[in-house]
From Swiss-Prot:
UniProt xrefs under Pfam families: BRCT (PF00533), DNA_ligase_aden (PF01653), DNA_ligase_OB (PF03120), DNA_ligase_ZBD (PF03119), HHH_2 (PF12826), HHH_5 (PF14520), Nlig-Ia (PF22745)
GO molecular function ontology, one term from the record: metal ion binding
PANTHER family given in the database record: CHROMOSOME TRANSMISSION FIDELITY FACTOR 18, DNA LIGASE
Reactions performed catalytically: NAD(+) + (deoxyribonucleotide)n-3'-hydroxyl + 5'-phospho-(deoxyribonucleotide)m = (deoxyribonucleotide)n+m + AMP + beta-nicotinamide D-nucleotide
List of residues binding NAD(+): 35-39, 84-85, 115, 138, 172, 288, 312
Name the UniProt record assigns to this protein: DNA ligase
Transmembrane segments: none
Amino acid sequence: MDIPKNIKERYEKLKAEIEEHNYRYYVLADPIISDQEYDKLFKELVELEKKYPELKTPDSPTQRIGGIVVEGFNKVNHLIPMLSLDNTYNEEEILDFHKRVLKNLSLNHVEYFCELKIDGVSVALRYTDGVLTQAITRGDGTTGEDITQNVKTIPSIPLRLRENLTIEVRGEIYMPKKEFVRINSEREEKGLPVFANPRNATAGTLKLLDSTEVAKRKLSSFMYYVIFPQNYNLETQEEAINFLKEVGFRINPNYKNAQDIGQVIEFWKEWNRRRKELEYEVDGIVVKVNSFELQRLLGETARSPRWAIAFKFEAEQKETKLKAIKLQVGSTGIITPVAEFDPIQLEGTIVKRASLHNFDYLKERDIREGDYVLIEKAGGIIPQVIGPVKEKRTGEEKIIRPPEKCPVCGGKVGKIKSSEVAIRCLNPSCPEKLLRTLENFVSRNAMNIQGLGPKILKRMVDAGLLKDIADLYYLNEQKIRSLGEGIGDKTVENILTQIEQSKNRELDRLINALGIPNVGSKTAKDLANHFKNLDSLIDAKFDELVEIEGIGEDIANAIIKFFSQEEVKKIVKKLKDAGVNMGKKEEEKLEGPLKGLVICQTGALSKMTRQEFAEYVESKGGTFSENVTKKTNILVVGENPGSKLDKAQSYGITIMSEEEFFDKYGES
């Protein structure tokens, strides 16, 4: 059908506007609109493409949603080889590299460009007339695989450049540390093998055949190299980095133009010390001769360039004695082996326990109780047992085999699916499963029932007071007092008050608290916003669920299966009968001293957490923003403020200390 001219013009304007906001957010870190305003523009674009499918183009921002499933990945030849880098680990070796460079060039001085070495997956991006046409993995260096549809889902990679260039650039795709932790927690809950580190998680994600699934994992990127730089009048790596940023790519801001090898070493020392500050993994720095002409003169070997080297950080590993391997039962029945070892200090924290994930992990690494083992932090966050120090074995070490019965209740164990690695307790009445479910139900992000910690919940389960989560709402003074020692008047009153108050929690908290597999706080909010009440969610059909952004087939099936269980139906009825809120409350525009003001925070506050401060701001009629934009009215500064302070100062935004803010606007 003929598309009206004004619709075509609006469509092109929307595309350009959204890409401009993507550039400001991901490349410049300087957004000028709120998330809500961005979502409104994006939704309008989606609606236009639904109504007029002929409008849709390969560079449309809606390509980031995914939805394309491929049968496999085609092989693609690289224009020039994607070489790997030689590695060096100490100052002596980097000085040897420097001497080789000077000797080969017959020079006394060379300028270097130093970049952080992102621990991710290398990619080549090809653009034709400014539009992304192909994304290729490194592969064997000569031939890679076409992963274009998956790469299109990564928000920091532009689908259209700011100039109509035909160009190939190279860089790194990575998974942020927080996303790595989230995905591994989710996989462990599903009984799937966990990823060893963020790099493996990134590689696994990019090899998924369904781009919708890729879009759910928040990958990001940094570009750092231009193929055939002379075609764009670029003479140095520093010029290339600035050029990449100008045309729309996200570049890593932590780089240095080093005038001598001493400055290279200082840069390496600085980031070896500061790398824990970063939201992504780095495993060293990359040192490049800055001049492209000198790079050309130095050339390459068959495997690596002579003009660049990776100056690696040593991963901090500690050796300790694995005293015991305990078996832990989770809320879904998964039995997880947990290592308990002599306490060690690792990257600034004391650690003495680490998950061993599953029994396949134990077997593959031949980890035994009583071994001396090496520990490091996966993704710089989670303590992980790397493997045993076999030369220290005495023969008294004990092999831990999968249990034949539940270590807590003695019930049957097995696998729900033959494909999963997890072994589960299959007893629906297992007290340990119930205890973990209760702990989730009362937690801060769920029903937020304070005063019911793990110890008192265990006493209640052991005493038979709690058979399911709904039994919490049928506790009374007599039942709580029957627990005996340590339960005084104040404790009883506090527990009953907290339980009563929790009946009025928002619907999304209840959904999160129920323990639906694969449904966390973000998904729970999406479900609450869509269905408005629990009954509508319970009755929802598969097709309706998958229409909700962020709800894939796995989550939809998990929701349907969860609410089809007779046990769950009984629990929901008991919760209703007890007066627990089952519907989303109508949002009221709160009046207060902060009405109409957008408030942002940087640094740690002494009075409350970030989440509590956000809730406080909104309770006073204000809007809490995670980012400083030109629409921010006040930045509240706590201890150790970050870059938001500099940005707020450059925008002329009102800056207040925590004390000044609460003096003016009152405390909760």
